[in-house]
Amino acid sequence: MKKSDHGKKILDGCKVLDLTQYLAGAGVTRMMAELGADIVKVEISPIGDPGRLLPAVKDERSGFFVQHNRGKKSLCLDWNKPEALEIIKDLAKDVDIVAENFGRAEILEKRGLDYESLRKTNPDLIYLSVSVFGRDTPWNKKPGYDYI
């Protein structure tokens, strides 16, 4: 290792738009943050990531949420409002990776947040889609948020 590389992490300079919730996706993007990536997490209002409500809670903060979302910047938007979707799409133009774990592709497709839609303005985009049950299985419509 060169002296100039000392302290540098493998994902330094990598920008990630985090559209994940609960555990599986949030764990992946937390590891990216630990490896130096700049993570912007966009949560769905009014409560944000449902993981915020999981025990143990102290001083109105969930230990689960803090553990799996440390090192990230976060904002909360109403994904049913067009102006909120435009903010997310604008963020997606300037990132290297978009991460999501909704399981059901139509949730993001109907909002224009799927890979095909986002790559129109960011052709080099890497789209990380975490699906517990896979996209081509009989259970592909079932939600799943745990580690895989």
For each predicted feature, which ranges?
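N-terminal helix-loop segment corresponding to the beta1-alpha1 unit
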Residues: 1-148
